[in-house]
Design a protein with these regions (language model features):
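Conserved PLP-binding active-site segment of the aspartate aminotransferase-like
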Residues: 45, 123-128, 145-175, 180
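Conserved core segment of the aminotransferase class I/II
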Residues: 20-90
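Short, conserved catalytic or adaptor-binding loops enriched in Gly and charged residues
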Residues: 15-20, 105
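Conserved glycine-rich beta-strand-loop-beta hairpin in the small C-terminal domain of fold type I
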Residues: 73, 89-100, 111-125, 135, ...
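Short, conserved active-site loop motifs that form the nucleotide-linked donor/cofactor pocket
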Residues: 24, 111, 144
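Conserved N-terminal glycine/acidic-rich loop preference
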Residues: 63-69, 95, 120-144
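Conserved PLP phosphate-binding loop immediately N-terminal to the Schiff-base lysine helix
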Residues: 1-14
């Protein structure tokens, strides 16, 4: 869960605060904030687990490049990571707003829309006679990849992400999705 992209609602409290300051381990990576090809992950351990970690860490190899780690450290130290985060927040906020506009343009008010907690996705519940498998198959056959969240009596809920899609592709993809769910 990426709280740095939560801008449409109050951010979720950290696990550490929810656990009352008890033993919580944070594990993450910089793939979303920087480049997916930068395979540097991080782990934040509470002091009480550090000794156990050090005992086990010797059994594992470090696979991240030292040069990349040093460059990332300097990037963070110089404030560039914070600037990159602000830039991506603005970008994703704009793209999500555009996606919402295009959904309303194509589907009107006939589909329930829920905005994802991380601010980069929407959940649409589509009323269709298709099963989720049939919808997925028909969409795939026409070059549209769908992430189906659930199928229920109210319809099929699909997740639309704005983070990895160009804004100019929103309208054609949504138009195709509408055609797929409405055609007999």
């Amino acid at each position: 869960f990426e709280n740095e992209f939560v801008y449409l609602q109050k951010p979720t409290p950290s696990l550490y605060s929810l656990a009352g300051g008890q033993d919580v381990v944070y594990i993450g990576s910089f793939s979303r904030l920087l480049l997916p090809s930068i395979r540097i992950s991080f782990m934040v351990l509470p002091p009480g687990l550090l000794a156990a970690y050090k005992e086990k860490a010797a059994c594992y190899n470090q696979t991240a490049s030292k040069a990349e780690q040093i460059a990332l450290c300097q990037f963070i130290r110089d404030g560039h990571l914070a600037a990159q985060t602000r830039k991506l927040r603005r970008l994703y906020s704009s793209k999500l707003h555009q996606l919402l506009q295009e959904v309303e343009r194509v589907f009107g008010t006939e589909v329930p829309i829920k905005i994802g907690a991380a601010g980069t996705s929407l959940a649409l519940t589509l009323s269709t006679k298709l099963s989720k498998d049939a919808l997925s198959r028909k969409a795939r056959a026409q070059g549209l990849g769908l992430q189906i969240q659930k199928e229920g009596p109210e319809g099929i809920t699909v997740i639309l992400s704005c983070s990895s899609m160009k804004t100019e592709d929103f309208l054609p993809a949504l138009t195709l999705l509408r055609k797929i769910v409405t055609e007999p």
